[in-house]
Amino acid sequence: MKQRELRERAAELPAEPGVYQFLEDNTVRYVGKALELRDRVRSYADPRSERIRQMVARADDIDIALTETETQALLLEANLIKRHQPRYNVRLKDDKSYPLVQFTNHSVPRIEVTRDPDSDATVFGPYTEVKRLETAVKALREVYGLRGCSDHKYNNRNRPCLEYEVGLCSAPCTGEIDATAYRSAVESAVQFFEGKTGILADPLRQEMQAAATAEEFERAANIRDRLAVIESFHGGGEAAVSSEDNSHTAETTSERAVDVLGVAIEGTTATVARLHSDNGQLVDRSQHRLNAPTGEDRASAVLTAFLTQYYAERSLPDAILCSEHPHDNDVREWLSVEGVNIRVPGTGRESKLIDLALKNARNGSVHDNESAALADALGFSIINRIEGFDVSHSQGRAVVGSNVCFIDGSAATDAYRRKRLTDTNDDYARMQELLTWRAKRACDGRDERPDPDLIVIDGGKGQLRAAREAVETTGWDVSTIALAKADELVVTPNGVHDWDADAPQLHLLQRVRDEAHRFAVQYHQSIRDDIHTVLSDVPGVGEQTQQALLRRFGSVENVRSASRDALCDVPGVGKQTADTIANRL
């Protein structure tokens, strides 16, 4: 991604907290968090290290998710890193490693605060306040007697240690507690980190009351202070959805998996943002686009369509929070029968989550605005699906063509295709060959992809003329335009458009054009490197001879099938070299 493109993309972002992801071929390469997304992403135009410079150079897109606070951004960032394992994420942002809690994978697990968890451990976090976390872990050890010693110490104990004497451990190492009881204690501690605050708060409250009754007021005060930390542990911005939220009835306490849905409508396209909370933490989000219906209650109709289409073949969450009431009673009844609590929050924490989902939905409509602007500028009723084409080669060698696809302004990499073309140094002929291939496959029903609304060619009038000849000769009814690199002029059959540099429709075409170019160059380089490797491994065949062979025969495959006499006709190739080439290839 070029500096100019990065700055332009950053300028489109809101100055709000959130998480950003640098993507390469739709693969997450880097995840970061920011208090202000716009400034943070803009800073990558001037990278601070070679590692980050390489990451930015390879990235072809940026995705974001908005959050309410930097803490929520941290938690979402950590979960996305955990899920995607991005190549360029060495540690969490700002060179800080945030603490986690792990229960080790041992027959008698230990609990500990760590910044470097075991790969097979049960892990919770990260958490932003280590003191609060250590207070919670110490309280859990006191209440449930969980060990905190290393496996080496555990395996070499023959009598209880000091931690048993002070009430921090139940001494499973010497059999002071049986395995079943210890496992039950571990399960209770795990439930606390899953969001069940009462697992720890209730026994502490009882202990505090007992101390007060016994007039041990100093001890009662200490327990009270710890209890305050425990009761706020899942509520002070650490949790997105609390399973102990007092604003709802007792039935919500069993809601571990919760989806939050927000709808934004822009013209004829609707965006549904889905936030997913698991055990009280915001762990994932996604965006989905649908055709917006006409008439009243459009958002309600969109939600109804989304609920049936999205959840028909997926696991249902325990609850779904919606920005609008779905207008179809059958959908609500279906979800109710499946045990899903669907509701529209009025106030409180859940209402804030709805606001957050709506922010993400509105942000997701930026690409829709670009598509609408492009359709407007070209006189189309709608442009949802665009395919881009480009040709790449080195002086007529290793000629390849790319075919990329964008749907609703975003790259759809599963619809990308590429093709090896005839090795000749003629850009127009090769573009015609590439488009003929695509058009014939479409007309013959051999391409499972839908026809695009628009084709974008990387080039000028010559490339566009060649592409249109291929499309029209084949009888494929698809509109075709070109985007020239030098002046960023949009060439159409009816004329040339010189749009402003900040025009949203131009940004969309540039992304399609640049992605087609990148995909073609990538494929060409892989083919070229293969050719170079095969011929360069033949003794006695230098660079000039390699070029002469490829000029004469067109490809390594043709060199391989050539007779020895034909090989000897090439300047620089004698009988011995011809024998070597034939034997090696």
Swiss-Prot record:
Q: Kindly state which keywords UniProt assigns to this record, in alphabetical order.
A: Cytoplasm, DNA damage, DNA excision, DNA repair, Excision nuclease, SOS response
Q: Which Pfam families match?
A: HHH_5, UVR, UvrC_RNaseH, UvrC_RNaseH_dom
**Which locations, inside or outside the cell, does it occupy?**
Cytoplasm
Q: Which residues form the GIY-YIG domain?
A: 15-90
Instruction: Identify its protein family.
Output: Belongs to the UvrC family.
> Which PANTHER family does the UniProt entry name for this protein?
UVRABC SYSTEM PROTEIN C (PTHR30562:SF1), UVRC/OXIDOREDUCTASE (PTHR30562)
Record's protein name: UvrABC system protein C
Q: Which organism is it from?
A: Haloquadratum walsbyi (strain DSM 16790 / HBSQ001)
